[in-house]
Amino acid sequence: MTVTLCSPTEDDWPGMFLLAAASFTDFIGPESATAWRTLVPTDGAVVVRDGAGPGSEVVGMALYMDLRLTVPGEVVLPTAGLSFVAVAPTHRRRGLLRAMCAELHRRIADSGYPVAALHASEGGIYGRFGYGPATTLHELTVDRRFARFHADAPGGGLGGSSVRLVRPTEHRGEFEAIYERWRQQVPGGLLRPQVLWDELLAECKAAPGGDRESFALLHPDGYALYRVDRTDLKLARVSELRAVTADAHCALWRALIGLDSMERISIITHPQDPLPHLLTDTRLARTTWRQDGLWLRIMNVPAALEARGYAHEVGEFSTVLEVSDGGRFALKIGDGRARCTPTDAAAEIEMDRDVLGSLYLGAHRASTLAAANRLRTKDSQLLRRLDAAFASDVPVQTAFEF
């Protein structure tokens, strides 16, 4: 049989859905997957067929969606979001994944996307293709039975609560407006298209033999969606909490801690979530899980580095940056902006493309990556400046998986 890589036709999608069902334990089914297809640009998908002509088997697939990602400086970038990547178990170790990624990266570059992004099913796969983990998922579990808010925590007065308990499907417009405010100011924020709002709210309904009904807590500047765990009836899981002010964040947590029928509240958040410091006993907010979130590949180094903002406090400095398989660039940072141009000058900082992806949003420090020899420079002062320049004054978060 001849293995061929090409764009899928409509006849390929049933085979793609079969491969998805066999590959992804969380496959959402053909109906929902068809809705996600509306986010895929023309020529944004590839398949590998074993055989030629009608009836040939789909043994590999990958696609990208047209997304909008917020980066430091409240800048929103067109972003290619890779997803639906799978290789049949009958065709592993034949280079199919590499071939599909190479072809998609060519198309993404030709379309002018400065960055590509994905959520990795396994942590050891995508670094070789230039992707680096750029956000961190951090689960906190609070024993609410003993939780008390610090006297300094916002909203500690005797006035009425600014939070309402509501049904999610009845307040979509308010959720959308709050989320839109949130995603435009937070590095890692993603525009959520209408089809994904449809899916999110559909998932809030109870499923026979599956998840329980979700409820919502609504504040003028934030919301939280939560449901009781499927098997542990004393655990409430917060599936999404978005707050655009510290007051809203604390008010939502006061309401969650008020779920008296629960023993524990869990949330997948980010490492800089202030929740533990709202409590008199910080140990009650335990870290129960941690993993990489969004991964980034810098497709166009000058365009990406010139697009984001940088810390003003650093002052002006210049260096020469070499990115393996990406080029060598004169980088000048000053007044919160960067100028990046190709150069033949000797490199002062060296790193692989995946390392630049990890640095880009500001969640990971240059000095940490240098300590692991993933970033290399002989100038310690330059490293400190790079550290400070790439830091984000707004904590980096993960919007949603795709």
UniProtKB/Swiss-Prot annotation:
PROSITE patterns the UniProt entry points to: GNAT
Family: Belongs to the acetyltransferase Eis family.
Subunit structure: Homohexamer; trimer of dimers.
Keyword terms: Acyltransferase, Antibiotic resistance, Host cytoplasmic vesicle, Secreted, Transferase
EC number(s) reported in the record: 2.3.1.-
NCBIfam families reported for this sequence: PRK01346.1-1 (NF002364), PRK01346.1-4 (NF002367)
Chain ranges of the N-acetyltransferase domain: 3-154
Known regulation of activity: Is potently inhibited by several small-molecules that share an isothiazole S,S-dioxide heterocyclic core. Some of these inhibitors, when used in combination with KAN against resistant M.tuberculosis, efficiently overcome Eis-mediated KAN resistance by restoring the antibacterial activity of KAN. Some of these compounds also inhibit in vitro acetylation of DNA-binding protein HupB.
Free-text domain note: The Eis monomer consists of three regions that are assembled into a heart-shaped molecule. This shape is formed by an unusual fusion of two general control non-derepressible 5 (GCN5)-related N-acetyltransferase (GNAT) regions and a C-terminal region. The N-acetyltransferase domain of Eis is responsible for its modulation of ROS generation and pro-inflammatory responses in macrophages.
Gene Ontology biological-process entries: aminoglycoside antibiotic catabolic process; biological process involved in interaction with host; effector-mediated defense to host-produced reactive oxygen species; response to antibiotic; symbiont-mediated perturbation of host inflammatory response; symbiont-mediated perturbation of host innate immune response; symbiont-mediated perturbation of host programmed cell death; symbiont-mediated suppression of host programmed cell death
This protein's name: N-acetyltransferase Eis
One of the record's GO cellular component terms: cytosol
InterPro entries: Acetyltransf_17, Acetyltransferase_Eis, Acyl_CoA_acyltransferase, Eis_dom, GNAT_dom, NAcTrfase_Eis, SCP2_sterol-bd_dom_sf
MF (Gene Ontology): aminoglycoside N-acetyltransferase activity; identical protein binding; N-acetyltransferase activity; protein-lysine-acetyltransferase activity
Superkingdom: Bacteria
Pfam family, one: Acetyltransf_17
Function, in words: Effector that is released into the host cell and affects host immune responses; it negatively modulates inflammation, macrophage autophagy, and cell death through redox-dependent signaling. Acts as an acetyltransferase. Acetylates 'Lys-55' of dual-specificity protein phosphatase 16 (DUSP16)/mitogen-activated protein kinase phosphatase-7 (MKP-7), a JNK-specific phosphatase; this leads to the inhibition of JNK-dependent autophagy, phagosome maturation, and ROS (reactive oxygen species) generation for enhanced intracellular survival of M.tuberculosis.
Reactions accelerated catalytically: L-lysyl-[protein] + acetyl-CoA = N(6)-acetyl-L-lysyl-[protein] + CoA + H(+)
Documented effect of changing C204A: No effect on catalytic activity on AG substrates. Prevents artifactual CoA adduct formation during crystallization
Listed result of changing Y310A: Nearly abolishes catalytic activity on AG substrates
Active site, UniProt feature: Y126 (proton donor), F402 (proton acceptor)
Further facts: Increased expression of eis due to point mutations in the promoter region of eis is responsible for resistance to the second-line injectable drug kanamycin in a number of M.tuberculosis clinical isolates, through acetylation of its amino groups, which leads to inactivation of the drug.
